[in-house]
Amino acid sequence: MFDAYGRNIHYLRLSVTDLCNLRCRYCMPDGVPKLAHEDILTYEEFLRLAALFAQCGIDTVRITGGEPLVRRGVEQLTAGLKAIPGIRRVALTTNGVLLAQKLPALLAAGLDSVNISLDTLHPETFRRITGKDELAAVQNGIRAALASGIPVKLNCVPQPGVNEGELESLAALAQEHPLQMRFIEMMPIGFGAGLPGLSGPELLERFYRRWPRLQPVTGAAFGDGPAVYYSAPGWRGSIGLIAAVHGKFCASCNRVRLTSQGFLRPCLASESGTDLRALLRSGADDAALLQAIQNTILAKPREHHFGQGSMPATRGMYRIGG
């Protein structure tokens, strides 16, 4: 389906929980309130809505959280999504802590690709960022994913004074392994709003100094998301830059987000949207739900306005689904 600005909206990010087993300082630090169990959509509700999204042209679904793997039954949800006519790809974004043990069942369910958060290679820094001592588990998850052959992307948020000294070491993972190592600008959303970041142009300059033969790369393997990818001769993978603040890519945005509470958000940086849970639970039929989805997509804003204030912490990434 095309929105009011001619963008083909075919990608749904599906947040299945607000819970997480880490406490990353820019996303979900200690002390944030949990949602009530009854406020979260059931898998049956997610699948009913996903089938309607498919009728609107959604062909790619990414399962997110919180941390999606802390919710029981994500494998069954994956299989259910894959069975919906029109859904071509189902992907997962995870912190990786539970990935090694969950991956076989996810692959059997038809999972197509996985994105794993990795902000550091050092245990002490990992504890500082996440509040937990789980780096080894994350690394095991990455190794398991690479060994399985499923496409792997790693996501890093550069943070001055925290992990900026090891960004080249993280980038070098793409030199050594067949993966995409992506660097995402800190966004002024929720708890990340008060934290400093490094811009995409700054990062690219650093990486060019280290690897002067880096060249932009494109193609189907790099998807149609916001990242701009680079590689060099002899590399097994690539690095990606997602410059959400300094390289606004709204003109090519192709996605909408459904929160775990059933709120359809057409833009990551906007408070606007539609409460599909209220419609679902008040007895709305499929025609009414489909119309609500279509109206929300048509109302997708032209662009974000990160420079004009931040979203409140109560609307943190862990609630939106990233």
Named regions from a protein language model:
Residues 4-44:
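Canonical Radical SAM [4Fe-4S] cluster-binding loop centered on the CxxxCxxC motif
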Residues 16, 35, 67-71, 159-162, ...:
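Short, small-residue-enriched loops and turns at beta-alpha junctions
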Residues 23, 27, 71, 124, ...:
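Residues that scaffold the ATP/ADP-binding catalytic core of kinase and kinase-like folds
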Residues 16, 20, 24, 63, ...:
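Conserved, mostly hydrophobic/aromatic
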Residues 22, 123-124, 248, 274:
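Glycine-centered loop/turn positions within well-structured domains
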Residues 32-36, 100, 122-129, 190-194, ...:
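A short acidic, helix-capping loop that chelates divalent metal ions and anchors anionic groups
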Residues 40-63, 70-184:
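Radical SAM/AdoMet-radical enzyme domain recognition
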Residues 1-11, 168, 176, 186-189, ...:
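Auxiliary Fe-S-binding modules of radical SAM enzymes
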